[in-house]
């Protein structure tokens, strides 16, 4: 039904040209898609080698078409968080606007709060409306110009119409042993990203590469960040509160238990804080990639 919906929109819905920004970091796009490269994996149930693919979430600068950050895996809040975190930690800039679709984890309160922190304006597009997101157009060209050269290229997604967008599946299935492992395939993809970023931008009259365009220019609407500001951006505030107990501050996330005590300047347990706050509930601010410490926030 989804592909029929796409075809209907392409045929009958009015099309609006997207006016792209003239400067990098004015607008970032984020989207999840199938990573169109096969890798070999062992099927334990059927005791045989099989060809598989995975998904990737990419963040792209709309002006330069520079790929800024990625995360391997299905589109959800975790992959969104990891990809945008990579983009901001690498380039240390807060874009003016971010556009995503309405799929994945964007509707979760924690996701909405996260996107509100990392840009000045966050918008979503309609699902399955390819023309509304320039990243899908760029990713199509990325596949055609770079990824298709690899022997384990799967062909583009089912909505692609060009014959060159598809590959001989039978040939690949007969040669599964020649496919790369998952880690080797990920390295292939990262090399493809590097090639794309170092290619000339299609609208540059001087042959400026995407990387050169992105690193040379910058939008006055974007905000430069230092190391501390970047770290603070990625701390999340827990949705639920936790009661401080005799054992300290104890909670579970993703089926893993975490225990914390509050210490004074000498490195000893702060008994004054401990005695005063047993039974008091706090929300906590945490870094999902560094759980060595958390901040307690009064409810």
Q: What residue ranges belong to the model's regions?
A:
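Mobile-element integrase/transposase regions
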Residues: 1-55, 66, 83
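Intrinsically disordered terminal and processing segments
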Residues: 1-26, 113, 117-129, 135-136, ...
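Active-site beta-loop-alpha junctions of metal-dependent nucleic acid enzymes
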Residues: 70-93
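C-terminal, beta-rich DNA-binding module of retroviral/retroelements integrases
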Residues: 38, 186-299
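Globin-like tetrapyrrole-binding proteins
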Residues: 6, 96, 102-225
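Short, surface-exposed connector motifs at secondary-structure boundaries
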Residues: 64-67, 91-97
């Amino acid at each position: 039904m989804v592909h029929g919906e796409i075809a209907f929109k392409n045929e009958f819905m009015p099309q609006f040209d997207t006016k792209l920004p003239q400067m990098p970091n004015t607008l970032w796009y984020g989207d999840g898609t199938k990573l169109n490269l096969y890798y070999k994996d062992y099927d334990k149930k059927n005791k045989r080698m099989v060809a598989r693919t995975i998904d990737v979430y990419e963040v792209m600068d709309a002006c330069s078409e520079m790929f800024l950050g990625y995360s391997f895996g299905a589109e959800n809040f975790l992959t969104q968080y990891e990809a945008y975190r990579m983009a901001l930690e690498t380039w240390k800039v807060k874009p003016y606007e971010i556009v995503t679709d309405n799929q994945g984890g964007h509707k979760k309160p924690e996701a909405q709060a996260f996107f509100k922190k990392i840009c000045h304006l966050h918008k979503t597009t309609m699902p399955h409306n390819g023309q509304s997101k320039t990243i899908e157009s760029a990713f199509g060209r990325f596949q055609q110009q770079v990824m298709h050269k690899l022997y384990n290229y799967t062909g583009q997604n089912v909505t692609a119409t060009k014959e060159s967008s598809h590959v001989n599946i039978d040939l690949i299935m007969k040669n599964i042993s020649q496919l790369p492992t998952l880690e080797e395939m990920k390295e292939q993809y990262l090399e493809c990203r590097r090639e794309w970023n170092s290619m000339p931008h299609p609208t540059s009259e001087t042959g400026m590469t995407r990387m050169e365009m992105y690193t040379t220019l910058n939008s006055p609407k974007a905000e430069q960040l230092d190391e501390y500001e970047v770290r603070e951006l990625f701390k999340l505030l827990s949705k639920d509160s936790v009661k401080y107990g005799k054992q300290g501050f104890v909670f579970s996330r993703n089926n893993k238990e975490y225990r914390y005590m509050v210490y004074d300047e000498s490195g000893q347990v702060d008994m004054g804080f401990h005695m005063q706050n047993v039974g008091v509930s706090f929300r906590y601010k945490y870094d999902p990639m560094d759980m060595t410490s958390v901040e307690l926030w009064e409810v």
